[in-house]
Amino acid sequence: NGYYTSFMHPNTSTFWNREEVYKKGYNIDEYNDINSFQNIERAGEFYSDEGFFKEAVYLMNSYENKFCTTLVSVTTHIPFYLDGVSNLDEKLTITEEDLSTFENETFRNYLISCNFVDYAFGEFLEELQNAGLMENSILVVYGDHGAGIEANTDLEKLYSENNLEYTQIEDKIKDVHIPFGIKVPNIKDNINIQRSVSKIDIKPTILDLLGIKDNFSLGKSIFTNKDYSFIKGLGFITSENYCINEKIYNRQTLEEIEE
């Protein structure tokens, strides 16, 4: 449909063999890994989303025609270290008092990294706006998987502080929840989709918004009224139930269904 396609990721090309996958498998027009960027600070084992987003806006602003770009950021990936980020304290709103009730170091680092990425993403949106790239663009944001933290004690504290009851099955259900949002030009009212949706629904949803016929997709546009289950690991999820380890739980009551 005439879109210039590009991929950007501040990591090496050998990780998940991304270069081969995107160039030969997806046949994209432009591939960018860490070697394509010049001014990105280290953030522990990875690179800072703040610098990555700035470089991404610079590259996208250089495209002459309409484009479809995929960005994969890494700062909120475990182990959540931010060593190397300049002036970090000035970019955080989370305080030591906020963190004081959590004993698990990994979970504390997770909260700090999320707080930093929240700042970096805000800067990213502002730079997109200043570059004139937001007016006619669909922006899709999603996470690829859960945090991967084994910190049940801290999660219990987090739930209790927000007057929520914590259970192991609820933790399993929430672990499959990832952030997913779409910003569409000229649509001001928020729409909250309550049905079960998955990453395989992203492509058909975008094509639906663009009015492009979808000849084949495993998923469905989230704007359809059809509900269905999808697989997470060895579990099955619908809007009503969650099945894992040969047991079925009601998602509203979190109680096991015996029959």
Which residues fall in each region the model found?
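Solvent-exposed soluble domains appended to multi-pass membrane proteins
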Residues: N1-E259
